[in-house]
Amino acid sequence: MLIIETLPLLRQQIRRLRMEGKRVALVPTMGNLHDGHMKLVDEAKARADVVVVSIFVNPMQFDRPEDLARYPRTLQEDCEKLNKRKVDLVFAPSVKEIYPNGTETHTYVDVPGLSTMLEGASRPGHFRGVSTIVSKLFNLVQPDIACFGEKDFQQLALIRKMVADMGFDIEIVGVPIMRAKDGLALSSRNGYLTAEQRKIAPGLYKVLSSIADKLQAGERDLDEIITIAGQELNEKGFRADDIQIRDADTLLEVSENSKRAVILVAAWLGDARLIDNKIVELV
C-alpha cells in the first residue's frame, strides 16, 4: 500500500494508473476509520481495479473550531486497517498541502439550496466545505467511481447534484448505513460517548423506526409525529436538535406526489451530535 502526502506525487501515481487503463475508485474520509468506512472500501474494491482512500480532516467544513480541534487524528491506525483491506493508495495530505494560503481566500464550490437547508441551516458553511474538498479530490484523483455512506444523506444528495451540475464523469455510489447490533449507526462521533451514553445511544434508532412505522401505517400529521418523536428523544436522555420528514428524492417538503420519504434525525447526547436517517416508501 502506497501512502502519499503531496499533490505532485499523487498526480504522478494517477497518471501511471490512467496509462495502465485501471478503473479507479475513491473513498474520501476524514480518518478515525471504523467498520462503516471499511464497508465503503469493500464496495469500492468490488467495483474498481484500484482503490484510493483519502484521509484529510477538512477545516473548511467545521463550523465550530472546538470540533475541529478535538476531531480524532488516528492516521497510523487508519493506515494499518486499510493495509489489511489491501487498499492500493492512501492520500493523507497536510492542511498546508490542500490549502497553501489558508481557507479564507481559497476558491470554494457551493451547491445552492442543498448547502443551506436542513443540516446546512444549523451548520453554516459546512456543506460548502464538503463540496469544495470533494470537488478538489475529484479533480486530483480523477476517479471512475466514488463511494459515500448513506448515513450522511444530505451530503450524498449534495454531492450527486454537484457532480451532475459540474459535469464530473464520476459514478457516485451510496453505501447503506452500517449499524451496531443494537441499531446505532456507526460513526466516528460515537467515540465521544461515555459508557453510559453508549447504552442510551441506540434510542435514536428506536425513535427513528417508530416514526417510520407511523408513516407506513398511513399517519400523515407530520408535525404531530415530529413533536412526539422530539419528546421521546428528550425522555430517553437526548437533546433533540432537528427532526425532519422530507421527500427522499428532492429533500423538499413531503407532498401528495411524494413516493418516498426520508426521516432525518439529529440529537445531542452529551458532547456528541448524532445523526441518522431512514427511507420509507409512501406508495
Swiss-Prot record:
This is Pantothenate synthetase. GO terms for biological process: pantothenate biosynthetic process. Its main location: cytoplasm. It comes from Escherichia coli O17:K52:H18 (strain UMN026 / ExPEC). It is found in: Cytoplasm. Its EC number is 6.3.2.1. Pathway: Cofactor biosynthesis; (R)-pantothenate biosynthesis; (R)-pantothenate from (R)-pantoate and beta-alanine: step 1/1. Belongs to the pantothenate synthetase family. One of its GO terms (molecular function) is pantoate-beta-alanine ligase activity. One of its GO terms (cellular component) is cytosol. ATP binds at residues 30-37, 149-152, 186-189. The reaction proceeds by a bi uni uni bi ping pong mechanism. Keywords: ATP-binding, Cytoplasm, Ligase, Nucleotide-binding, Pantothenate biosynthesis. It holds the Pfam family Pantoate_ligase. Homodimer. CDD domains: PanC. The lineage of its organism: Bacteria, Pseudomonadati, Pseudomonadota, Gammaproteobacteria, Enterobacterales. It catalyses: (R)-pantoate + beta-alanine + ATP = (R)-pantothenate + AMP + diphosphate + H(+).
